[in-house]
């Protein structure tokens, strides 16, 4: 099937992008694999007129907003991120009325409608850098409260206001499981994603995005306790097969696992449904996405 997909892809001039959390076999046929920020940046540089996104819905939306002239397909249109819906436009409007000198910062894990009401987007790989550069004193970060809490510790000259959203995978990591792994493997370093709760991050030797965690594993050291979605192991073992990884809890995103080779082949054969974003919303949502790319500077 992989050979058929690559043949069809070449014939139809289609670029396949995949997030680190999708199954390894999907990552293997993708042209580009990375975290949310890398995929958003990469999409703006592609010459292909059609993009297939193996990830969750907000990723495809962001790519379509940044590339309105391209045809964008989700591998599974129902692969959604629950956290993206854990903030409302009403709440954002209330915060703008309550605070002067306020910037509304949205994690890229948000809907296009929410982005349209925000000032700048962030990802876990550039959040601290971007928030540090904002001129506003008050910063309302949506929708992820755990990421916002982490940023609060890193950017101390801002009044960061937290929302109550969370990642359904990272938020369920059990503290006792991480402690147990640390006791079992005392030489292993703990690498955690900032979507985890503070009690988990307090045990981490390194906190960073999926790309950051991979880079950290590829440095010195042989044993690592990984506190993020298990799909990340595919890229790590591809680059460093002898590293020993120990995962805290199950850590599987069911939405990411909806992306399959069968669905990709079907899109290449039949066309599939094109992802569309309302023109007015897309125009407004483009502003925070472009500001993110500008402030991230890489």
Curated annotation (Swiss-Prot):
The keyword Metal-binding applies. [4Fe-4S] cluster binds at residues 81, 167, 253. Binds 1 [4Fe-4S] cluster per subunit. GO terms for molecular function: 4 iron, 4 sulfur cluster binding; metal ion binding; quinolinate synthetase A activity. GO terms for cellular component: cytosol. InterPro entries: NadA, NadA_sf. Keywords: 4Fe-4S, Cytoplasm, Iron, Iron-sulfur, Metal-binding, Pyridine nucleotide biosynthesis, Transferase. The keyword Ribosomal protein does not apply. Pathway: Cofactor biosynthesis; NAD(+) biosynthesis; quinolinate from iminoaspartate: step 1/1. It catalyses: iminosuccinate + dihydroxyacetone phosphate = quinolinate + phosphate + 2 H2O + H(+). It is an enzyme of class 2 (transferase). Iminosuccinate binds at residues 19, 36, 107-109, 124, 193-195, 210. It comes from the Bacteria. Its EC number is 2.5.1.72. Its cofactor is [4Fe-4S] cluster. It is found in: Cytoplasm. Belongs to the quinolinate synthase family. Type 2 subfamily. Catalyzes the condensation of iminoaspartate with dihydroxyacetone phosphate to form quinolinate. This is Quinolinate synthase. It comes from Fusobacterium nucleatum subsp. nucleatum (strain ATCC 25586 / DSM 15643 / BCRC 10681 / CIP 101130 / JCM 8532 / KCTC 2640 / LMG 13131 / VPI 4355). The gene is nadA.
């Amino acid at each position: 099937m992989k050979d058929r997909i690559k043949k069809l892809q070449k014939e139809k001039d289609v670029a396949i992008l995949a997030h680190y959390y999708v199954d390894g076999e999907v990552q293997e046929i993708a042209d580009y694999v990375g975290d949310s920020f890398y995929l958003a940046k990469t999409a703006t540089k592609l010459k292909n007129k059609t993009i297939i996104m193996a990830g969750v819905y907000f990723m495809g939306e962001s790519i379509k907003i940044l590339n309105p002239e391209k045809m964008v397909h989700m591998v599974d249109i129902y692969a959604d991120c629950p956290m993206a819906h854990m903030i409302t436009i009403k709440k954002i409007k209330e915060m703008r009325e309550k605070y002067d000198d306020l910037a509304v910062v949205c994690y890229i894990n948000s809907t296009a409608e929410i982005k349209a009401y925000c000032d700048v987007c962030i990802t876990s790989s550039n959040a601290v850098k971007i928030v540090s550069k904002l001129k506003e004193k008050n910063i309302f970060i949506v929708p992820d409260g755990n990421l916002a809490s982490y940023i609060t510790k890193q950017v101390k000259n801002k009044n960061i206001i937290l929302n109550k959203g969370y990642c359904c995978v990272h938020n369920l990591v059990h503290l006792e499981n991480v402690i147990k792994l640390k006791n079992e493997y005392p030489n292993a370093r703990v690498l955690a994603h900032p979507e985890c709760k503070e009690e988990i991050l307090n045990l981490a030797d390194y906190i960073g995005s999926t790309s950051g965690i991979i880079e950290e594993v590829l440095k010195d050291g042989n044993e690592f306790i990984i506190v993020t979605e298990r799909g990340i192991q595919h890229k790590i073992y591809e680059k460093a097969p002898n590293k020993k990884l120990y995962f805290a809890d199950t850590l599987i995103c069911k939405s990411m696992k909806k992306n399959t080779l069968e669905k990709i082949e079907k899109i290449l054969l039949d066309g599939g449904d094109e992802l569309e974003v309302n023109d007015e919303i897309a125009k407004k949502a483009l502003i925070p996405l472009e500001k993110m790319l500008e402030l991230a500077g890489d």
